[in-house]
A protein has these predicted regions:
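An N-terminal assembly and electron-transfer interface module characteristic of large anaerobic redox
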Residues: 1-174
Length: 174
């Protein structure tokens, strides 16, 4: 992904010393904020499901999904990446180097929280709020009861058992 993005966007890089992109420019332009979802791939574990859920979450917050890459992205899509207000690094093992390069070269803000799990989803929402300078966003309804439910579902079944976790790095760590 990094090589594709860098190769395609090299000729669009801002002149050295120019001002960085403002992640809140969407306000001046009178539109909704938009983000790129970077990292999902065809070989990823449940990537299509993750994209669907993250898009729903973004929609709830009033944020548009601009480009999803590399999954399904064309060279024309990759050329549109700098039009977004920020990049969401959904799979750091695939997209972190691209997001860091876009941050350095285009001044694009990067959201690093991966919304897998209740606490991580809350961090993701708050990071989006800070990066895009959104108005206050409501907390997830009944969030205080969710961790208890999450802990209790498999706790008796898995207690004392050995398990093997098979997934990409993002899902395994989550």
């Amino acid at each position: 992904l990094y090589q594709l993005i860098r190769g395609l966007l090299k000729h669009l890089m801002p002149v050295a010393g120019s001002s960085k992109a403002d992640p809140a420019r969407w306000r001046q332009e009178g539109r909704r904020p938009r983000v790129n979802l970077l990292g999902p791939s065809l070989l990823g574990f449940r990537c299509r499901d993750d994209i669907r859920e993250v898009r729903l979450l973004l929609e709830e917050l009033g944020i548009d999904t601009h480009v999803v890459a590399p999954l399904g992205a064309t060279p024309a899509d990759l050329l549109r990446i700098p039009e977004a207000d920020a990049n969401v690094c959904l799979y750091p093992e695939v997209a972190e180097s691209s997001c860091r390069w876009l941050e350095r070269q285009f001044g694009m803000a990067m959201v690093t929280s991966v919304p897998i799990g209740i606490a991580a989803t809350q961090r993701f929402r708050h990071e989006l709020q800070q990066v895009l300078q959104l108005d206050a966003i409501p907390e997830v309804a009944d969030a205080s009861r969710m961790p208890w439910y999450s802990r209790s579902v498999d706790s008796t079944y898995l207690t004392g058992k050995r398990v093997f976790i098979f997934a990409d790095a993002t899902h395994a760590i989550a």
